[in-house]
Amino acid sequence: MIIDFAYAANTGAAVIPVDGLVPLPNDQVKAKDITVSPDSTKFTVKTGGIYQVGYVVNTDKALTAGARLLVNGEPKEGAAVGGIAALSLSRLSNEVLLRLSDNDEISLQIFNNPIGTALLPAPVGASLRIVRLS
């Protein structure tokens, strides 16, 4: 059963610095208990529980960079994809179940990008979905 949910996207081209957080300022569906930082890079869950979190990152060309979820600024095990020097990808996606505590903060990060930037092409360069299940 879905208790609460939030969604946000980046629908314009954006330049993301090395190990930068992905801004998600567009098409926001705001949840009752999930708040968004002013720069649209951090999503805070007010109530702890089990959350299903999914993301998609599209780049304009294949990169060796990866994407991952951070919880309170720390990489969450099992929530990363890509980031392997021998593997170039232009679409990175993942979906995980996370046990979160009150006021935990979720961010989407691009990491291990030797070029220093990842260009996210329109119409949807990246999206993040957060669903509270319990």
Where are these regions (language model features)?
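Extracellular jelly-roll beta-sandwich "head" domains, especially the C-terminal globular C1q domain
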Residues: 1-134
